[in-house]
């Protein structure tokens, strides 16, 4: 957020600049505020978060707007989705941040199972435990028949985020599940 170079391994936003100002774009049509955010201090802010390794290779982590902030930790919805989607019973998933009573957000996973497969929410939590940081493991899980999608089949994350915690959400904390740290 401060246009400073990150250390290898740390999370940061991909930003770029050209030796010719505003090459390729003049900003967002009729959106002056969004254009100001895009072009800040001579840098183009992509809105993508990632890490650079020791060899200078870059790795995408998430869209800045879709990253989840939970108890002081930045969580990539993209990375949590990848772990959950690797489970044999899971067809697709979408992970969003929902409001927390402690401030910031809690992690909610909405999951569609493959036809003929069954898995409990606790089994999914136990699947996640050895594969991701404890703070990224979803607190809420909703198993559904489908995810909301655009005509081009992109998941409409904003709809799942807007709905918040719904009646079909299983709550890991209410279930008394203790995570291994």
Where are the model-predicted features located?
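Short gly/Ser/Thr-rich phosphate-binding loop of adenylate-forming enzymes
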Residues: 1
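Phosphate-recognition beta-domain surfaces
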Residues: 11
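FAD-site-proximal beta/loop scaffold in flavoenzymes
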Residues: 42
